């Protein structure tokens, strides 16, 4: 087993040696899913045979509008349930060796797998600090004995506040500590949601479009925070449609289309895959998704806007 935090060069060398095919086994998978299907009426939103997420890496989950990325996130984190399919094995997935197939969203989060949402969930009528404290594990009120013994709950509450203030400084939100969360900008709410997710010291964080609605001034800050998470040993799985971001920070890329995993590999290889480009651009599969000339076209801007509507 590899020691953590990872050395990125060693990680990329390890991943580069893999067979870049859908469902490939990882050297040290923290999350593995099998036979996960979700149908809505006659439409199949997710149909994943097998996929693994490498521990300690930044993995991007990409795909065109309606690919099933957010639905897959919802299934893995207990916000939705798979559809039983006759003649197929029952859906199963495990996190850090523990089965999560029938685990509630609350228990998933307490087990170390935290997610954020494309539309931020900041509690607007609470202060920034209060929002942070909600994300803390082992709240004093969760244990009757601790709640009745003041020295115990006071100590835990003080530790939670110290942790929250540390994270607010790290995310440069400390000046907003006592402000109402509803007064934050869209980008600041993204930072708050990511910071709050770290209150419970997760082993893995799942980010659903972390850059959606973020102005360029905060984009670089978010990128640096995501890379710092990886450098500290936290596994990151994120949905994103900014191909430059995907190429810049990802160690591994998984591609979904029509609910299925159609490709996996290193970012530079996936971006040049004709199957992946075809999934985004149809017949225009002579283009590299990471090229400036492609990203700046009206076609890509239109596709990105359509993709952002996926979970609205």
Predicted features by range, described:
Residues 2-312:
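Glycine-rich phosphate-binding loops of nucleotide-dependent enzymes
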């Amino acid at each position: 087993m590899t020691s953590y935090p990872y050395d990125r060069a060693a990680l990329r060398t390890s991943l580069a040696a893999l067979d870049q095919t859908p469902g490939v086994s990882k050297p040290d998978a923290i999350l593995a899913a099998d036979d996960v299907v979700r149908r809505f009426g006659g439409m199949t939103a997710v149909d994943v045979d097998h996929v693994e997420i490498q521990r300690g890496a930044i993995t991007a989950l990409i795909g065109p509008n309606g690919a099933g990325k957010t639905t897959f996130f919802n299934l893995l984190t207990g916000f939705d349930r798979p559809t039983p399919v006759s003649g197929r094995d029952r859906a199963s997935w495990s996190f850090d060796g523990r089965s999560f197939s029938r685990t509630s969203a609350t228990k998933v989060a307490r087990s170390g797998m935290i997610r954020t949402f494309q539309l931020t969930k900041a509690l607007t009528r609470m202060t920034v600090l209060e929002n942070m404290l909600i994300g803390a594990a082992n709240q004093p009120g969760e244990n009757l004995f601790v709640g009745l013994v003041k020295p115990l709950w006071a100590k835990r509450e003080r530790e939670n506040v110290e942790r929250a203030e540390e994270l607010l400084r790290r995310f440069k939100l400390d000046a907003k500590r006592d402000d109402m969360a509803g007064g934050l900008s869209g980008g600041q709410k993204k930072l708050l949601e990511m910071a709050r997710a770290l209150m419970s010291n997760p082993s893995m964080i799942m980010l659903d479009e972390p850059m959606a609605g973020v102005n360029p001034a905060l984009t670089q800050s978010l990128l640096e925070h995501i890379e710092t998470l990886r450098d500290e040993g936290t596994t990151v799985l994120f949905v994103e449609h900014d191909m430059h971001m995907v190429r810049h920070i990802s160690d591994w890329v998984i591609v979904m289309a029509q609910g299925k995993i159609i490709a996996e590999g290193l970012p530079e290889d996936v971006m040049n895959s004709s199957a992946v480009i075809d999934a985004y651009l149809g017949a225009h599969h002579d283009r590299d998704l990471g090229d400036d000339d492609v990203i700046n076209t009206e076609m890509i801007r239109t596709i990105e806007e359509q993709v952002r509507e996926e979970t609205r």
